[in-house]
């Protein structure tokens, strides 16, 4: 299911973000890059996955008639 896969990717990216915030060596620009990637992935999950129209959660997809 694409929505579950992208939700897992989102959780993974933000887990990486939390780890980069805790490490002093990775703080700063690295954590901001990871946060920006996570923000883009959330937009993909929110809008992009419904355009696929496949999977168990395809009730919100757009139909092409």
From Swiss-Prot:
GO cellular component terms listed in the entry, alphabetical order? chloroplast thylakoid membrane; plasma membrane
Please list the GO biological process terms of this entry: cytochrome complex assembly
Q: Where are the transmembrane segments?
A: 5-19, 33-53
Write out the entry's keywords from A to Z.
Chloroplast, Cytochrome c-type biogenesis, Membrane, Plastid, Thylakoid, Transmembrane, Transmembrane helix
Q: How does it sit in the membrane?
A: Multi-pass membrane protein
Record-linked InterPro entries: Cyt_c_assembly (IPR002541), Cyt_c_biogenesis_CcsA/CcmC (IPR045062)
Q: Which Pfam families match?
A: Cytochrom_C_asm
Subcellular location(s): the record lists: Plastid, Chloroplast thylakoid membrane
- Chief place where the protein resides: plastid
User: This protein's superkingdom?
Assistant: Eukaryota
What Gene Ontology molecular-function terms does this entry list?
A: heme binding
Q: What does this protein do?
A: Required during biogenesis of c-type cytochromes (cytochrome c6 and cytochrome f) at the step of heme attachment.
Q: Which family does it belong to?
A: Belongs to the CcmF/CycK/Ccl1/NrfE/CcsA family.
What PANTHER family would the database entry show? CYTOCHROME B_B6 PROTEIN-RELATED, HEME EXPORTER PROTEIN C
Q: What is this protein called?
A: Cytochrome c biogenesis protein CcsA
Species? Pisum sativum
């Amino acid at each position: 299911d694409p929505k579950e896969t992208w939700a897992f990717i989102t959780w993974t990216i933000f887990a990486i973000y939390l780890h980069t915030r805790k490490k002093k060596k990775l703080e700063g620009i690295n954590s901001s890059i990871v946060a920006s990637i996570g923000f883009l992935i959330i937009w993909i999950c929110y809008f992009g996955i419904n355009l696929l129209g496949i999977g168990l959660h395809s009730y919100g997809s757009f139909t092409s008639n």
